[in-house]
Amino acid sequence: MQQIHRLERKLLRATAEAIRDFDLVSQGDRIMVAVSGGKDSYTLLHLLMRLRERAPIDFDLVAVNLDQGQPGFPAQVVEDHLRSVGVPYRMLQRDTYSVVRRLVPEGKTTCPVCSRLRRGVLYNAAVEMGCTKIALGHHRDDLVETLLLSALYSGALKSMPPKLRSRDGRNVVVRPLCYAAEEDVAAFAEAMRFPIVPCDLCGSQPNLRRKRVKRLLAELSAEHPAVKGNLLHALAHVVPSHLLDRDLHRQLADATGRDPWLDAEDEEAEDCGEPPAGDGVVSLGGARGGR
């Protein structure tokens, strides 16, 4: 029980900090919490329910689970949990599984297509239900893995934003767990004995690139525990004068009337390998530093 309280306090602090830093929850919000049956979404729902009890603003939560037609998906397990915690919920059924199987060649990972179809269903449901925001369970590790995936395999410096507006402008997606470490989420979910639904029911091939990046981060973290926290910290401490983006350079030059590159300090000889000082929490304001 002591471990549960310790982990809950830590995760509540990280979640509340992210909500404050990025204005993720507002007065009167009706927030759809996408609950897949995995550790991340169960934990997100629990934390938002706890924060709602003590928040100085009023907001509503509705949990939504989507059964996409994967063989053996235990929708009743998820529904029983949602009923037991006393949150309003909706169980949706859309056979996107057969669509994915038709579109994706045998042996290829189905995750990207499946994700887009799932997102479309949730977006439409949020509008129909009058939800102002959709909360997803992506955590710190998801953000830093995506940062490396984008840089290494796509040649772009980007990750998952803490909030975004959908392309059609109808939905706002928020990620309140963006400061939370995956190992804390996993430990909390295990301690709480959430009824976890496996994510491989569809039989899809694993995302090998993401798994490779995850292994790389694990190896680096074994040598330098602050690696993941530092990468998250880097996402909020961009130094434009030390990058090669000419469009960004032009925007800054137009805004300031100065050439950012000529104003850059010579930092090439500096040792950038030291972890942040303190107890492992670095304000972005807010993002978590080394663990």
Swiss-Prot record:
| Cofactor, how bound (note) | Binds 1 [4Fe-4S] cluster per subunit. The cluster is chelated by three Cys residues, the fourth Fe has a free coordination site that may bind a sulfur atom transferred from the persulfide of IscS.
As cofactor, the record names: Mg(2+); [4Fe-4S] cluster
* Location(s), subcellular: Cytoplasm
Positions occupied by motif PP-loop motif: 36-41
Q: Does the keyword Iron apply?
A: yes
Does this UniProt record's set of keywords contain Transferase? yes
Q: Which EC class does it fall in? A: transferase
Q: What is its EC number?
A: 2.8.1.-
Q: Which reaction does it catalyse?
A: cytidine(32) in tRNA + S-sulfanyl-L-cysteinyl-[cysteine desulfurase] + AH2 + ATP = 2-thiocytidine(32) in tRNA + L-cysteinyl-[cysteine desulfurase] + A + AMP + diphosphate + H(+)
Matching Pfam families, A to Z?
ATP_bind_3 (PF01171)
Residue spans of biased composition, Acidic residues class:
262-273
Tell me which GO cellular component terms the UniProt record holds.
cytoplasm
Q: Which domain of life is it from?
A: Bacteria
Ranges where the record places region Disordered: 258-291
User: Where is [4Fe-4S] cluster bound in this sequence?
Assistant: 111, 114, 202
> Any extra detail in the entry?
The thiolation reaction likely consists of two steps: a first activation step by ATP to form an adenylated intermediate of the target base of tRNA, and a second nucleophilic substitution step of the sulfur (S) atom supplied by the hydrosulfide attached to the Fe-S cluster.
Report quaternary structure and partners. Homodimer.
Q: What NCBIfam families has UniProt attached to this entry?
A: PRK10696.1
Q: According to its UniProt record, which protein family does this protein belong to?
A: Belongs to the TtcA family.
Q: What does this protein do?
A: Catalyzes the ATP-dependent 2-thiolation of cytidine in position 32 of tRNA, to form 2-thiocytidine (s(2)C32). The sulfur atoms are provided by the cysteine/cysteine desulfurase (IscS) system.
| PANTHER family recorded | AMINOTRAN_5 DOMAIN-CONTAINING PROTEIN, SULFURTRANSFERASE-RELATED
State the protein's name: tRNA-cytidine(32) 2-sulfurtransferase
Source organism (scientific name): Anaeromyxobacter dehalogenans (strain 2CP-1 / ATCC BAA-258)
